[in-house]
Amino acid sequence: MSLRLPQNPNAGLFKQGYNSYSNADGQIIKSIAAIRELHQMCLTSMGPCGRNKIIVNHLGKIIITNDAATMLRELDIVHPAVKVLVMATEQQKIDMGDGTNLVMILAGELLNVSEKLISMGLSAVEIIQGYNMARKFTLKELDEMVVGEITDKNDKNELLKMIKPVISSKKYGSEDILSELVSEAVSHVLPVAQQAGEIPYFNVDSIRVVKIMGGSLSNSTVIKGMVFNREPEGHVKSLSEDKKHKVAVFTCPLDIANTETKGTVLLHNAQEMLDFSKGEEKQIDAMMKEIADMGVECIVAGAGVGELALHYLNRYGILVLKVPSKFELRRLCRVCGATPLPRLGAPTPEELGLVETVKTMEIGGDRVTVFKQEQGEISRTSTIILRGATQNNLDDIERAIDDGVAAVKGLMKPSGGKLLPGAGATEIELISRITKYGERTPGLLQLAIKQFAVAFEVVPRTLAETAGLDVNEVLPNLYAAHNVTEPGAVKTDHLYKGVDIDGESDEGVKDIREENIYDMLATKKFAINVATEAATTVLSIDQIIMAKKAGGPRAPQGPRPGNWDQED
């Protein structure tokens, strides 16, 4: 009797080469195990004392960061269940800017504790129902835990309350300098609210960052306008600062238009050759004179600048700057109010822009061109000039600034100004409240709700671990501070008890009001929503079916024997 080999299920349904993983093979447990690997990797990067990771992507670029969204974006992840969490962190990054590590760690912890529930016999449906009930309860409780609100969004000191904790979680120790830079740059571009309660419009693209090697972070500064990491093309390098200067922006080349087809010109003598070149010179001279007669003192070109055109522009005393990036060209038009012109010729008065200062500066060893507006006016773009010793450090600082700017964007939302206690104080309080809610819930769903509360313990525990504190000592002290009310204390004083990452107190607990450590309500709500949805999505998957990858046969990787051009 011949041996009968088992076949893949649905072998006649899909093409050859597909893979299928179902619950019969322990698919959920395997997905949780795969996510746990990523969860452990991001765990040590959370908080102000979080460790950095060195990532070498598929292009060989070295990235040093502790931001979960950046790490996951650069890694080539193929597991479909893990990709669900990657998309969740990306969504948090796009919408709120901050809280990406919280999304990844909380979602991973929710799946870790769900594994215990599955081993106890609970079905995935019951766990999902319990998690959704706990999520709705948590969002309601967060509204009751608000301890402050930023009312004046144009006040620089109020902005610092919200920007500083965001940046300190990425670049601890440099948060004072960076938060001052971000708040100053935001104050330059943020319009003043005309009415009480009006929310000003803020565009994150209005804050630009220019990185210049050399010096230290304390040498960084903010320019009310734009900075280009190149100098002008001609002899004119700067314009006087006693008046406003007219600016013309061209997206076409500053040169004679050439035909697409080649032509031949027959010249009989030297005079014909001189007359031929004179025609070009007169045409270019006439164009540049028309531009100069309009009072233009600065030209920004998005394409090439011909030598002949540059010669006449130097003669008329016009500064010429080449900006190859169409995005930078668009931002410069916003700064000076100019209209980009696709044709070479004299612009109309409505198409010209105005700028107060155009000058070339030497910062470090680089020459940069600065377009600066008046101090009393609201600029549409502000630029932060960063100084540092290494390119990797500058890139990481830029990502921290981007998070701070994105947090300002979240602040401009209707409920963005409300603040929650930071340093793990909110999570400790949520554990107590969600656990009590689970005890009031009948049936098996209370097990899932209680485990949902247990998952929040990962935040204060990780903050204490990365700070080098004894977790077994800090967590009990933190629970006691939230459950025991001191004599004469205000009823809500326990909400402000968080993890002391500096180790100034023996108990590892401090009042977060001393350091103004707050979290944004909108960011926390969005992170809990996204993390819970990602975890329940993974739990709801009962089978993974992966088709065969597209593509033909791969070329041999090793060297061919013999000479390189030898025939087969």
Curated annotation (Swiss-Prot):
<dbReference type="GO" id="GO:0006457">
    <property type="term" value="P:protein folding"/>
</dbReference>
<feature type="modified residue" description="Phosphoserine">
    <location>
        <position position="505"/>
    </location>
</feature>
<feature type="cross-link" description="Glycyl lysine isopeptide (Lys-Gly) (interchain with G-Cter in ubiquitin)">
    <location>
        <position position="15"/>
    </location>
</feature>
<dbReference type="GO" id="GO:0005524">
    <property type="term" value="F:ATP binding"/>
</dbReference>
<dbReference type="InterPro" id="IPR012721">
    <property type="entry name" value="Chap_CCT_theta"/>
</dbReference>
<dbReference type="GO" id="GO:0051082">
    <property type="term" value="F:unfolded protein binding"/>
</dbReference>
<keyword id="KW-0963">Cytoplasm</keyword>
<dbReference type="GO" id="GO:0005832">
    <property type="term" value="C:chaperonin-containing T-complex"/>
</dbReference>
<keyword id="KW-0143">Chaperone</keyword>
<dbReference type="InterPro" id="IPR027409">
    <property type="entry name" value="GroEL-like_apical_dom_sf"/>
</dbReference>
<comment type="function">
    <text>Molecular chaperone; assists the folding of proteins upon ATP hydrolysis. Known to play a role, in vitro, in the folding of actin and tubulin. In yeast may play a role in mitotic spindle formation.</text>
</comment>
<dbReference type="InterPro" id="IPR027413">
    <property type="entry name" value="GROEL-like_equatorial_sf"/>
</dbReference>
<keyword id="KW-0547">Nucleotide-binding</keyword>
<comment type="similarity">
    <text>Belongs to the TCP-1 chaperonin family.</text>
</comment>
<protein>
    <recommendedName>
        <fullName>T-complex protein 1 subunit theta</fullName>
    </recommendedName>
</protein>
<dbReference type="InterPro" id="IPR002194">
    <property type="entry name" value="Chaperonin_TCP-1_CS"/>
</dbReference>
<dbReference type="Pfam" id="PF00118">
    <property type="entry name" value="Cpn60_TCP1"/>
</dbReference>
<keyword id="KW-0832">Ubl conjugation</keyword>
<dbReference type="GO" id="GO:0051086">
    <property type="term" value="P:chaperone mediated protein folding independent of cofactor"/>
</dbReference>
<keyword id="KW-1017">Isopeptide bond</keyword>
<keyword id="KW-0597">Phosphoprotein</keyword>
<dbReference type="GO" id="GO:0140662">
    <property type="term" value="F:ATP-dependent protein folding chaperone"/>
</dbReference>
<dbReference type="InterPro" id="IPR017998">
    <property type="entry name" value="Chaperone_TCP-1"/>
</dbReference>
<keyword id="KW-0067">ATP-binding</keyword>
<dbReference type="InterPro" id="IPR027410">
    <property type="entry name" value="TCP-1-like_intermed_sf"/>
</dbReference>
<comment type="subunit">
    <text>Heterooligomeric complex of about 850 to 900 kDa that forms two stacked rings, 12 to 16 nm in diameter.</text>
</comment>
<dbReference type="InterPro" id="IPR002423">
    <property type="entry name" value="Cpn60/GroEL/TCP-1"/>
</dbReference>
<dbReference type="GO" id="GO:0005737">
    <property type="term" value="C:cytoplasm"/>
</dbReference>
<dbReference type="GO" id="GO:0016887">
    <property type="term" value="F:ATP hydrolysis activity"/>
</dbReference>
